[in-house]
């Protein structure tokens, strides 16, 4: 994934120093796009190890509509723990907005599947996780926001749109805030996986995954790790194999996915900014 290394390098060389909500500080750029041909391999970063169970379980959790971390913790995924209440609640985050937007019974995922099957040329095949009604206040903690009925965090990956051409399904993700070192590799993998799943459900081949970022940043305490990653040579991409076709997009299990030939460099640890 040379595209991803070029992204890191561009931010490192062109980013401006900015403060941020966490107090860590960043090097930041505004506006960047990467394109991945899903016919040429699954875009899983190889210059460091990506924890595949976290990617898959988080996506299945989103699709379930759940906003409690119990499922994730039961599967040894703890990427959301810092923001949850003592009861494991995160408020109306991604899954809630995807499956029951604003609590009004609007299932955006089911609607997208139906539109792809019945009107694939539509330019309205999209899902938005951004709901201004529940955007949290920056003046109080994530947990306090949840108590007030808001989400613990606003969605970073805010909207995604599907596009069909030549019987191939492509997906474009718009990400308002992009943690380039820790977050973006997960986001690329997650939405590429979702594109494969939706394509299977709609009897389509996969096309491209397009990632578009707004505020793209490297945290100041990740610079050393970024330099380490940039020194590594990318390896061949793995291949995703989906072992069965469930009855619906909501019926996939972790065991349904196999990432063949995922060769990678060692993991690089970095502290997440809360």
UniProtKB/Swiss-Prot annotation:
Catalytic activity: dUMP + (6R)-5,10-methylene-5,6,7,8-tetrahydrofolate = 7,8-dihydrofolate + dTMP
Keywords of this entry: Cytoplasm, Methyltransferase, Nucleotide biosynthesis, Transferase
Subcellular localization(s) per the UniProt record: Cytoplasm
Enzyme Commission number, as recorded: 2.1.1.45
Pathway(s) annotated for this protein in UniProt: Pyrimidine metabolism; dTTP biosynthesis
Role played: Catalyzes the reductive methylation of 2'-deoxyuridine-5'-monophosphate (dUMP) to 2'-deoxythymidine-5'-monophosphate (dTMP) while utilizing 5,10-methylenetetrahydrofolate (mTHF) as the methyl donor and reductant in the reaction, yielding dihydrofolate (DHF) as a by-product. This enzymatic reaction provides an intracellular de novo source of dTMP, an essential precursor for DNA biosynthesis.
Subunit structure: Homodimer.
Matches recorded under PANTHER family: THYMIDYLATE SYNTHASE 1
Name of the protein this chain belongs to: Thymidylate synthase
Source organism per UniProt: Francisella tularensis subsp. novicida (strain U112)
Record lineage: Bacteria, Pseudomonadati, Pseudomonadota, Gammaproteobacteria, Thiotrichales
Name of the gene: thyA
